[in-house]
């Protein structure tokens, strides 16, 4: 079971890896790519902690979760229905973001809720196992959104 969880987490992290395609992005496309890249980098570090490759640092996870919450608040505004946002330089956003706006916003809401659960787990100083489970839920919410709304 643990192997499956780590495999799922590895797939998630791979899908979030910043590609060379980000070079040359401008404007709102670059802003959202930068935010996603930062979340990806932090998620990779947290994943290494849960794999035992790095010491578990709850302060780092807390700071990351707070940053995720700030990024999530602006995600709603970083995908306006404009030509630049839809077709801008190097965008990886699929048209389904605008065609299924309610579904896209539901995905962001799920991420916000999962991240809130992670923050609660940190606040109540739950076991490492429970904290890992909360983080995996956050990671899965990212993967789910990328599956439906991001070019691979």
Which residues does each PLM region occupy?
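Bacterial N-terminal signal peptides
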Residues: 8-15
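Sec/Tat signal peptide C-region and signal peptidase I cleavage site
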Residues: 17-23
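Positively charged n-region of N-terminal signal peptides that target proteins for export
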Residues: 1-5
């Amino acid at each position: 079971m643990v192997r499956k969880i780590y495999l799922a987490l590895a797939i998630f992290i791979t899908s979030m890896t910043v590609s060379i395609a980000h070079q040359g992005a401008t404007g709102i496309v670059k802003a959202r790519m930068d935010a996603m890249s930062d979340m990806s980098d932090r998620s990779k570090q947290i994943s290494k902690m849960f794999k035992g490759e790095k010491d578990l640092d709850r302060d780092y996870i807390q700071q990351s979760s707070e940053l995720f919450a700030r990024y999530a608040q602006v995600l709603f505004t970083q995908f306006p229905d404009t030509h630049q946002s839809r077709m801008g330089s190097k965008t990886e956003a699929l048209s389904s973001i605008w065609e299924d706006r309610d579904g896209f916003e539901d995905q962001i809401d799920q991420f916000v809720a999962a991240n809130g659960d992670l923050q609660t787990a940190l606040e109540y100083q739950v076991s490492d196992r429970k904290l890992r489970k909360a983080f995996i839920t956050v990671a899965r919410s990212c993967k789910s959104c990328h599956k439906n709304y991001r070019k691979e």
